[in-house]
């Protein structure tokens, strides 16, 4: 059996108010697998995604991404992951093109206007590339978030609450 792309072992998260969001989670995800996490509000789905992405630290347990530990090898693991958050988090006064291009740099990727153009065309946003984000509809803003998540060419993509908004 090949090594897991994402390996979660005995992962727990207890917040400062003693709320247990995750308790002894074990999960292995192989390359090419597509999974969906379903559960009620407060079940820990976003917490799990946030830990894998390095946004929240676990209380205990380990997570590896492509063999790299999410804590010890933070930059390496984070560069492999694209995240489309559940909340609209965009630079409102920037253009679509600049917003997506800027995201590449956050992951140490050199500018690549051709790659950004391809993503924007694939998401039917190319004709909006020079428009400020404040002028876009909610659905278009969601697509910009997807473009940002894909801009640094990750091998893993998380969609947190993809139907929200």
Kindly give the residue locations of the regions a language model identified.
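Conserved ABC ATPase "signature" region
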Residues: 101, 105-128
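Walker A (P-loop) phosphate-binding loop of ABC-type ATPase nucleotide-binding domains
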Residues: 40-44
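Conserved ABC ATPase signature
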Residues: 132-136
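Conserved catalytic motifs of ABC-family nucleotide-binding domains
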Residues: 153
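Conserved ABC transporter NBD signature motif
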Residues: 61-69, 77
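Catalytic Walker B motif of ABC-type/P-loop ATPase nucleotide-binding domains
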Residues: 157-160
